[in-house]
Design a protein with these regions (language model features):
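N-terminal leader/targeting and accessory segments in enzymes
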Residues: 1-71
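Phosphate-binding loop of NTP-binding sites
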Residues: 66-202, 206-211
Length: 211
């Protein structure tokens, strides 16, 4: 878990540094709630030696807890060799993901993103919910910087990928519509390099060019 409020007995707690909160400030709460292992970053561990000693659970020190979360999710995904569909795009990701989930649920046990948890924290959390009961996964992926979709694809190792469209909603991050297409197109690049299947919306001229 990355949220001390949701920790259950036996959980591993990863202390994530976010924009508003630092998970390291909630380690004691997580342990009191039943966490059996805490994962902290080296900077915090070196700055808080007394706390490290006082914690009565095993501690794992890593350079970056966000990257550790992603690596755990990647390794966990590899335990279950099931089809994974990644859903990206400027608009309609969540709606498209939910429609696909509903259709596939008629025949398969589907793991799907909850809400729109589609970033470098939400995607690993989704994959860590994967278990032997699931026969397919539908995972939403979002981006606000170059390289993010590639990073998420390396965690998901999708067998299939879908980009809904290329729009102007992310211009503040990528500058031009071509920049948006390049960022979203990282999914198709990954699929191409790893022999995956791209589902292309040919009605979108930008997608036609990058597919």
């Amino acid at each position: 878990s990355t949220d001390s409020r949701n920790v259950k007995h036996g959980d591993v707690f990863l202390a994530i540094r976010g924009e508003k909160f630092d998970g390291h400030n909630f380690i004691t709460t997580a342990v009191q709630s039943g966490s059996c292992v805490v994962v902290v970053d080296r900077r915090w561990a070196e700055a808080n030696p007394a706390m490290m000693v006082s914690l009565n659970v095993p501690k794992l020190i890593v350079e970056n807890t966000v990257l550790a979360l992603g690596e755990l999710a990647r390794l966990h995904r590899r335990k279950w060799r099931i089809p994974v569909l990644a859903v990206g795009g400027s608009n309609g990701k969540t709606t498209t993901k939910e429609m696909i989930r509903q259709v596939l649920s008629e025949k398969f046990k589907v793991l799907a993103t909850e809400g729109n948890l589609n970033n470098h924290i939400g995607v690993p959390q989704t994959m860590l919910r994967l278990d032997k009961s699931h026969t397919i996964a539908v995972v939403e992926v979002g981006t606000n910087h170059f390289g993010e979709i590639k990073y998420l694809a390396e965690i998901l190792e999708p067998t299939h990928g879908l980009i809904t469209n290329i729009g102007h909603e992310h211009l503040e991050f990528f500058g031009t519509i071509q920049g948006v297409a390049k960022a979203e197109g990282e999914m198709f690049d990954w699929l191409r390099q790893n022999k995956g299947t791209a589902l292309v919306n040919r009605d979108d001229s930008h997608l036609s060019r990058i597919s």
